[in-house]
A protein has these predicted regions:
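Regulatory and interdomain segments flanking nucleotide-handling catalytic cores
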Residues: 1-216
């Protein structure tokens, strides 16, 4: 039996994610490389950098729930629309079972597992098919999940309703590009970018992301 090594003296936000419909990808090696590259880009804010564990699943830990939510959004946008990811976030203590694989255990990990299983089940229903992120906290302390999950469900619905151009605009704005720069890239006017960002909810998603990032 593996010896459990405790890495943190205080609760953390565990992030678990996996690829939706991964078996349908014809080139699994390419899929693995793209996900691994996306994970490397969200490692800086992590307590334990997210990495692939078993199959197309990955896990990591962040100091706050907000940082984990923000990392999940960055991952989703960096892989969309070709690769769809679902997430579970859990708050609580965690322990690493194995340093080589990065596999974790403990209340925080169990909460994240519960969250991603709920996400997978919920997206099977027509009214909630665009849900991709959920949060659980069974510690009795820290951020409570109800308001966070309400915000995540609404944000995910907006995000899942975007077409490819709107996704590119959202991704560019989050990366710090101006609407004028994005207009040149897209071959449309800056006014058209602004109108699209307003009409499709891109501006609202950006505001929500700023608020959610600050969740403790």
């Amino acid at each position: 039996m593996a010896q459990i090594k405790v890495d943190a003296s205080s609760p953390v936000a565990t992030l678990i994610g996996d690829v939706v419909g991964s078996r349908e990808f014809p080139d699994r090696r390419k899929l693995h490389r793209r996900v691994a590259a996306a994970l490397a880009a969200v490692a800086d804010d992590a307590v334990d950098a997210p990495r692939l564990t078993v199959g197309d699943e990955f896990q990591g830990t962040y100091p706050t729930v907000g940082r984990a939510i923000d990392a999940a959004l960055t991952l989703r946008l960096s892989l969309a629309p070709d690769i769809d990811i679902r997430f579970g976030i859990g708050w609580g203590d965690v322990a690493k079972l194995d340093d080589a694989s990065g596999i974790q255990d403990g209340p925080g990990w169990w909460a994240a597992r519960e969250a991603i299983e709920w996400t997978a089940a919920t997206q099977q229903h027509s009214g909630s098919s665009l849900v991709r992120t959920a949060f659980r906290n069974r510690t009795g302390a820290g951020t409570q999940p109800h308001a966070v999950n309400a915000a995540l469900m609404c944000r995910d619905h907006l995000l899942g309703s975007l077409d490819e151009r709107s996704l590119r605009i959202l991704t560019g704005l989050r990366a710090g590009q101006s609407k004028k720069e994005l207009a040149m890239t897209e071959g449309i006017s800056a006014s058209a970018v602004s109108q699209r960002a307003n009409r499709t909810g891109v501006d609202l998603i950006l505001l929500a992301a700023q608020e959610l990032r600050e969740v403790p």
